[in-house]
From Swiss-Prot:
Name this protein carries in UniProt: Small ribosomal subunit protein bS18
Gene3D superfamilies registered for this protein in UniProt: Ribosomal protein S18
Name of the gene encoding the protein in the UniProt record: rpsR
GO process annotations (BP): translation
Composition-biased stretches (Gly residues): 17-27
């Protein structure tokens, strides 16, 4: 079954140029032709690996955040207590996440519900106070 071309001598299909979903555009070439574009990822250590010693270490502290509601047994989450709830809201009116506030999951959920209730009865603003 020979039709004039041998599979061993057949050339590669022609390269696509431009258009389509390939993202090639009219610039030509493929990603292998880019070379070093002078980015600073190498300077910052953009990889995911460890080896913090070559960059000067990680954080300067290792103190674990503790949930203040678990630490103080008499502290409770109350939607009417504006002073406590303002500690868990940013200046823009967003609820501070658990990894920053240090709350446990249970009390973070209670704080979020309390903030939403306080907003509903106008004790806390929904958004930032402009002025």
């Amino acid at each position: 079954m020979s039709n004039g071309t041998d599979s061993k001598t057949a050339s590669a299909p022609p390269a696509r140029s431009g258009g389509g979903f390939g993202g090639g555009g009219s610039r030509g070439g493929d990603r292998g032709d880019r070379g070093d574009r002078g980015g600073d990822r190498g300077d910052r250590g953009g990889g995911l690996g460890g080896d913090d010693d070559k960059r000067g270490g990680g954080r300067g502290f290792g103190r674990k955040k503790v949930c203040r509601f678990c630490a103080e047994k008499n502290a409770s989450v109350d939607f009417k207590d504006q002073a406590t709830l303002k500690y868990f809201v940013t200046e823009r009116g967003k609820i501070i996440p658990r990894r920053i506030s240090g709350n446990c999951a249970k009390h973070q959920r209670e704080v979020a519900v309390a903030i939403k209730r306080a907003r509903g009865i106008a004790l806390l603003p929904y958004n930032a106070v402009v002025g």
